[in-house]
From Swiss-Prot:
An example Gene Ontology biological process: protein transport
Keyword Membrane: yes
Role noted for this protein: Involved in mitochondrial or peroxisomal functions and amino acid signaling pathways.
Gene3D superfamilies listed in its UniProt record: YVTN repeat-like/Quinoprotein amine dehydrogenase
Protein name, as recorded: SVP1-like protein 2
Keywords: Cytoplasmic vesicle, Membrane, Protein transport, Repeat, Transport, Vacuole, WD repeat
PANTHER family linked: WD-REPEAT PROTEIN INTERACTING WITH PHOSPHOINOSIDES WIPI -RELATED
Main location: membrane
Record membrane topology: Peripheral membrane protein
Domain statement: May contain a beta-propeller domain involved in specific binding to phosphatidylinositol 3,5-bisphosphate (PIP2), leading to the association of the protein to the membrane.
Length: 432
């Protein structure tokens, strides 16, 4: 056994600097780009599936962005870090079965984000979003101008009639067979793409399915007064959630008619919303901010269009109900601040109680990425702490009329309160 090599590899693992984390389309896997290559994990239970080290030959190795294509052997890679594997203005579609590049696209500016489906490659630049066909060579279908989008914000809905893929380690499909084998794909199904508009606070909605590209229609949602900081589509592409750089309000709009369906309050203080995800059944929205607080909102169709809880009608008394302020239901002779009429999450947790931030800047400014496992379990991957966590929504009976400790009214007598409990956690360094 080469002892020096083993020690070196172990030291490299402990010092691993993560550059990017992304869940795949069904959130059953997630990929990690780092200074030496990339890793792919099964989400729950967490288990390492693929480990690629590009640092062996001494050449460039850093991967600053990675996107999986379901569970196939194709991944989108962009170089970065101290010693990049590829230039940051170059997108590589990596065939992990053959361990080589399958497609390459180069641009005049850095690639900030990449979204994949079996028929589309979406490339996000600072002021543009480009739509390509997933073919060899890739054919460009459309270019959309955006406001300065330094965080590469964009999201693509998941068409699950088109999501059947091979295991990452066993797939033998080529690019041509991947695209041509569309027996289960319905070209009339929407494949919604959301990204910032040309003006502050706007979101553009485009259908990038074959039928949608023929129509080439763009819907504009005026979502916020401030610049968009985070956005997310539900699986079916019918809802888009967004937060501005202020971070106090979460709004959910219809992508079909741009109507505002829900308006939720995250908090009173400014915060950066770092991640948002809808649950698999589109009934819940999880939101994580730089304050390390995880909120979950009910966006079930049973809710009213305004998102208010007081008008909720349901025959299931254990169904999660978003909270409202006690003063919001009282009639006052004069108008009261909008804050007291806000709708709040039905459960939340400050994750700092499980892992205090400490004094290290890397952990204080840590970024968590959200994924769902089922409809009641939320996975958070912390980039700097390199921690995987599983939080579960659990029910707790409330004997009283409401919880008045924080001034929020959960619901009526006999209904249920909900809480987020950390069920498990693991350190990514210990999984190699």
């Amino acid at each position: 056994m080469n002892t020096l090599s083993a020690i070196s590899n172990n030291k490299q693992s402990k010092e691993l600097q993560i550059l990017n984390i992304n869940f795949n389309q069904d959130q059953g896997c997630f990929a990690v780009g780092h200074e030496y290559g990339f890793l792919v994990y099964n989400t729950n239970p967490i288990d390492i599936r693929v480990k690629r080290n590009f640092n062996i030959n001494g050449h460039g190795s850093g991967i600053a962005h990675i996107t999986m294509l379901h569970r196939t052997n194709y991944l989108a890679l962009v170089g970065g870090g101290k010693n990049p594997k590829f230039a940051n203005n170059k997108l590589v579609i990596w065939d992990d079965l053959k361990r080589k590049n399958s497609l390459n696209l180069e641009f005049m500016s850095p690639v900030l984000n990449v979204l994949l489906s079996r028929i589309r490659i979406i490339v996000v630049l600072k002021n543009q979003v480009l739509v390509y066909g997933f073919s060899s060579p890739p054919k460009k279908f459309a270019t959309y101008e955006t406001i300065e989008n330094e965080f590469g914000l964009a999201d693509l809905s998941v068409n699950f009639t088109n999501s059947i893929g091979n295991n990452l380690s066993t797939s033998n499909s080529s690019i041509s067979s991947l695209v041509s084998n569309q027996v289960s794909y319905d070209s009339n199904k929407y494949q919604t793409l959301a990204f910032p508009g040309r003006s502050i606070g706007q979101i553009q909605i485009v259908d990038v399915s074959p039928s949608g590209q023929e129509k080439n229609l763009v819907s504009i949602i005026k979502a916020h007064k401030s610049k968009i900081r985070c956005l997310a589509l539900n699986r079916s592409g019918t809802l888009v959630a967004s937060a501005s750089e202020t971070g106090t309000i979460i709004r959910v709009h219809s992508t079909h008619n741009t109507a505002l369906l829900y308006e939720f309050r995250r908090g009173l203080d400014r915060a950066i919303v770092t991640s948002m995800k809808f649950s698999h059944d589109d009934s819940k929205l999880a939101v994580l901010s730089d304050k390390n607080t995880l909120h979950v909102y009910n966006v079930s169709p049973l809710n009213t269009s305004s998102g208010a809880t007081s008008d909720l009608v349901t025959h299931n008394e254990t169904y999660p109900v978003n909270r409202s302020h006690l003063l919001g239901s009282i009639a006052f002779p004069i108008p009261i601040p909008k804050y007291f009429k806000s709708t709040w999450s039905f459960c939340s947790v400050n994750t700092n109680k499980y892992h205090p931030s400490g004094s290290d800047n890397d952990t204080i400014n840590d970024v968590g990425i959200i994924g769902w496992s089922g409809n009641d379990s939320i996975i958070i991957i912390w980039q700097n702490k390199k921690i995987w966590e599983k939080y579960v929504i659990v029910e707790k009976r409330n004997k009283y009329l409401g919880d008045i400790n924080d001034g929020l009214n959960t619901s009526h007598q006999g209904s249920s309160n909900w809480e987020l409990v950390r069920f498990n956690w693991k350190n990514l360094d210990n999984l190699d």
